[in-house]
A protein has these predicted regions:
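PRPP-associated nucleotide enzymes
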Residues: 1-202
Length: 202
């Protein structure tokens, strides 16, 4: 599916942590530049897996206004969640990007995550990339919830997703035979290994 972009001027952007493991494989296979688009979901205090919005690398914040009333969070709790996530994004930017500038986003962007549940992490990333000048965004994800994917698909030029699921209960991890969360050290190591491999291939 993504073979059309092999050795093109497209840039693979991974949303860490989990998206990088997927993106490394795709970038190697297609012989493309790999970089990061750091986005993190905003979670309620009692559940670090469920998100009610996300914060992107440029400070873009998006909230799931339909979900928020059902969570019964106070305005203070919502703002605390946003602030905590903004700090997480800043930390990841410093650790994983350092002083390295973003790549030229005028190139076609293949945006990759490990899956799509509510879609707010990807929607926030797409919005940030648009603000930064991206004109062509291609979404590539291994698995997604159908309704959420339909909402996100309207915001990109193309979608590649081999495993689309329906139902009221959806978890990205369920689509994988082996699943575990990557920590920031592992993400940094994966990116460093890819960079070394790419430099040797030049």
């Amino acid at each position: 599916m993504l073979g059309l972009h092999r050795e093109s001027d497209a840039i693979v952007l991974a949303i860490p942590a989990g998206g990088l493991a997927v993106a490394v494989v795709i970038a190697k296979e297609l012989n493309l530049t790999l970089d990061l688009a750091i986005v993190s979901k905003i979670t309620p205090p009692w559940n670090t897996e469920a998100g009610y919005g996300a914060v992107a690398f440029d400070g873009t914040v998006m909230l799931n206004e339909e979900l928020l009333p059902r969570l019964h969070l106070t305005s203070k709790e919502i703002q605390q969640g946003i602030s905590k996530t903004e700090e997480k994004v800043r930390r990841r930017m410093k650790k994983l990007r350092g002083d390295r500038p973003m790549p030229d986003l005028q190139h076609p962007i293949i945006l990759i995550d490990d899956g799509l549940a509510s879609g707010f992490t990807l929607r926030t990333g797409i919005e940030a990339l648009r603000k930064a000048g991206s004109r062509q965004i291609i979404l590539a994800i291994p698995t997604a919830h159908k309704e959420s994917l339909q909402a996100v698909a309207e915001k990109v030029h193309a979608v590649y997703c081999p495993n689309i699921r329906r139902g009221s209960v959806f978890a990205v991890a369920d689509a994988y035979e082996h699943w575990r969360d990557l920590d920031e050290e592992e993400v940094a190591g994966l990116l460093e290994d890819f960079t070394k491999m790419a430099s040797k291939a030049v």
